[in-house]
């Protein structure tokens, strides 16, 4: 089990690390990102459902949208939407770690720890800092 908040953090780190995809490691990160896509799509589908379910409608049940075509919300709808979005963000989902058969150049990307199998990560202990 993983949490969606951790998945979104992983996606952030992947995007920051991929850059132009110039190295073998960066190309492998792109492939890992592709394998994570079904989990990301599931989160986005659930998120969109929450946004839609709490949007304001007029007397004819038509969605009320702003000039940017974004949903509008009543104060109550916005509060309910925000609570449901936070619940989703903190919720668990079933996750099977990605098996890596050729781990070269991935050991430096320690943010993958727990998300992939087959990589020996080089995790250096943090230095203690006196305050």
Whereabouts are the PLM-identified features?
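A composition-driven surface/loop motif
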Residues: 1-131
